[in-house]
Amino acid sequence: MKVNDLVTVKTDGKTRREGTILAVETFQEGIMYLVALKDYPAGIWFFNEADSKDGTFVEPKTLPDEE
């Protein structure tokens, strides 16, 4: 995923929230994404762990014609 991609993020709520990637930082353990959300337009950092599906918080938004 890259800057300006539409994504969904897993938060403490039950539904995923939609946002846009503002920045990407790669680390040995995974990738951090700065994601702008409706309530947080300046962005919040989310970390996707490299080796754990449970540690994946940011995923590409799937458009209806891509399903």
Curated annotation (Swiss-Prot):
It comes from the Bacteria. InterPro entries: Dextransucrase_DSRB. Belongs to the DsrB family. This is Protein DsrB. It comes from Pectobacterium carotovorum subsp. carotovorum (strain PC1). The gene is dsrB.
